[in-house]
Amino acid sequence: MNEVSIRTLNQETSKVLARVKRGEEINLTERGKVIARIIPASAGPLDSLISTGSVQPARVHGPAPRPTIPMRGGLDSGTLLERMRAEERY
């Protein structure tokens, strides 16, 4: 972690905040003593998992697709539709 004096922070605020944006943690000092810390804001725990590569962000927007449930009787949808259509005709 790097240290920045309050005086430097007042004079170069945008530069210090740019460093924080890049992920750097800054210790603020007053007369050589650390009095505060500026750390990058995190949107949540998911961001850290994405940055480490543990998870990947979704590629499709919207709700997640529901898992398919096997039909009773072992029929596929095509066979079931054929039977339903045949029953409607008579």
Swiss-Prot record:
Residues 53-90 are annotated as: Disordered. One of its GO terms (molecular function) is toxin sequestering activity. Keywords: Toxin-antitoxin system. Gene3D superfamilies: YefM-like domain (3.40.1620.10). GO terms for biological process: positive regulation of growth. PANTHER family: ANTITOXIN VAPB46, ANTITOXIN VAPB49-RELATED-RELATED. Belongs to the phD/YefM antitoxin family. Antitoxin component of a type II toxin-antitoxin (TA) system. Upon expression in M.smegmatis neutralizes the effect of cognate toxin VapC35. This is Antitoxin VapB35.
